[in-house]
Amino acid sequence: MPKSRTCSFCGGSIEPGTGLMYVLRNGQILWFCSSKCYKNFVKLRRKPDKLEWVRKVKKSLLD
């Protein structure tokens, strides 16, 4: 059975067979649920705690 993964940026769940895997130079693997999360984290270097939409996603996951 495929593993369920969580997004490294927003914390959302990633369905098996979808998402984006990004490997850092130190060997750490980051998983992203969408290109929006990938671009915000890797290219724009934004912190997830400072974005309102990320807080809403994390709050909805906890409820």
Swiss-Prot record:
PANTHER family: 60S RIBOSOMAL PROTEIN L24, RIBOSOMAL PROTEIN L24. One of its GO terms (cellular component) is ribosome. Signal peptide: none annotated. The gene is rpl24e. This is Large ribosomal subunit protein eL24. Its cofactor is Zn(2+). It comes from Aeropyrum pernix (strain ATCC 700893 / DSM 11879 / JCM 9820 / NBRC 100138 / K1). Binds 1 zinc ion per subunit. Belongs to the eukaryotic ribosomal protein eL24 family. Zn(2+) binds at residues 7, 10, 33, 37. The lineage of its organism: Archaea, Thermoproteota, Thermoprotei, Desulfurococcales, Desulfurococcaceae. The keyword Zinc applies. Pfam families: Ribosomal_L24e.
